Amino acid sequence: TEGPYFYIPMSNATGIVRSPYEYPQYYLVYPAAYAVLGAYMFFLIIFGFPVNFLTLYVTIEHKKLRTPLNYILLNLAVADLFMVIGGFTTTIYTSMHGYFVLGRLGCNLEGFSATLGGMIGLWSLVVLAIERWVVVCKPMSNFRFGENHAIMGVTLTWVMGLACTVPPLVGWSRYIPEGMQCSCGIDYYTRAEGFNNDSYVLYMFVCHFLIPLVVIFFCYGRLLCAVKEAAAAQQESETTQRAEREVTRMVILMVIGFLVCWLPYASVAWYIFTHQGSEFGPLFMTIPAFFAKSSSIYNPVIYICMNKQFRQCMLTTLFCGKNPFEEEEGASSTKTEASSASSSSVSPA
């Protein structure tokens, strides 16, 4: 059922469909489902906010973390905070009411904030992959990665994020309630007259999913080849072989994290776009959105907390200036000292 600035994925033959801006949507799912949605958003906030805020705080506290290669990690933390503050808090409030109680303006603001945070996070992973490839594989022999390059990378993420999220505010597509009608996103559902949804969805799918996917696979594929070649040249070195295994495991983890975050959402959005008019349950789009929003937790875990340098500084900050695991961390780093330069450049952080 399509109405002004909303789309409900069910027929209104019985006359029960109501505007998600004005009435609870309990006819879509049981009221308990909205409580589960609110609880899940609360879970993302209480875990996502501290770990991302701590990343920024620890970087301010420890000068050695303020290196050009870490700029993009800080940007990733900012993007996740944008999602947490601008998107998740709103969804908790609306799920308590069972509909998008904040109206059309609130839908635009929530859809813009959550999508912008997600897009900046996505492009941060792309820039991170490019930076690791450039530093480790050295495709440009005389190139030296510096602060200006790091700032350019961060700027690119915001430009691409805004290039994705601003058009729906000015008439190229639009933000509408989606899933259980308690949060807003891009209109993949309709071909509403005057919004050119078809061209926008194609642009979104190609420029903000396929291209990032290809770039990430290419960069990490080349990086793995470079690490394996280095390990093959030093077959006698146990530390090099261990470093290769660590890097391989980390790259696989990073790629899986990206796919878990964006593949379900992009696939379902594309299916809905190509099967417009067909009926589907409200959970059909809600569940993939859960995966995308969960990135505010597992992105910092993969890319920041698994970074030895960040982890040591975080523990030092949390334990008031002393890292209780310092001896273990030191022993671990000593074992891989011979390959520390390459592994630190490769690891997600």
Swiss-Prot record:
Query: GO cellular component terms?
Result: membrane; photoreceptor disc membrane; plasma membrane
Q: How does it sit in the membrane?
A: Multi-pass membrane protein
Instruction: Name the segments for region: Disordered.
Output: 326-349
Q: Name one Pfam family in it.
A: 7tm_1
CDD domains for the chain: 7tmA_MWS_opsin (cd15080)
Give the InterPro entries listed for this entry: GPCR_opsins, GPCR_Rhodpsn, GPCR_Rhodpsn_7TM, Opsin, Retinal_BS, Rhodopsin, Rhodopsin_N
Main subcellular localisation: membrane
Enumerate the glycosylated residues: 12, 197
Q: Does the UniProt entry include the keyword Nucleus?
A: no
Site (Plays an important role in the conformation switch to the active conformation): give the residues. 110
Tell me, which GO biological process terms does this entry list? Answer: absorption of visible light; G protein-coupled opsin signaling pathway; visual perception
Question: What stretches pass through the bilayer?
Answer: 34-58, 71-93, 108-130, 150-170, 200-221, 250-271, 284-305
Kindly list the GO molecular function terms attached to this UniProt entry: 11-cis retinal binding; G protein-coupled photoreceptor activity
Residue ranges that the UniProt entry lists as topological domain Cytoplasmic: 59-70, 131-149, 222-249, 306-349
The residues on the Extracellular side of the membrane are: 1-33, 94-107, 171-199, 272-283
Q: Where is this motif: 'Ionic lock' involved in activated form stabilization?
A: 131-133
Return the Low complexity bias intervals: 331-349
Q: According to the Swiss-Prot or TrEMBL entry, at which residues is a lipid covalently attached (S-palmitoyl cysteine)?
A: 320
Q: Which residues are recorded with the post-translational modification N6-(retinylidene)lysine? A: 293
Post-translational modification, as annotated: Phosphorylated on some or all of the serine and threonine residues present in the C-terminal region.
Q: Where in the cell is it found?
A: Membrane; Cell projection, Cilium, Photoreceptor outer segment
Q: Which family is annotated?
A: Belongs to the G-protein coupled receptor 1 family. Opsin subfamily.
Q: What does this protein do?
A: Photoreceptor required for image-forming vision at low light intensity. While most salt water fish species use retinal as chromophore, most freshwater fish use 3-dehydroretinal, or a mixture of retinal and 3-dehydroretinal. Light-induced isomerization of 11-cis to all-trans retinal triggers a conformational change that activates signaling via G-proteins. Subsequent receptor phosphorylation mediates displacement of the bound G-protein alpha subunit by arrestin and terminates signaling.
Q: Which PANTHER family does the UniProt record give?
A: OPSIN (PTHR24240)
What protein name does the entry list?
Rhodopsin
Q: Which organism is it from?
A: Myripristis violacea (Lattice soldierfish)
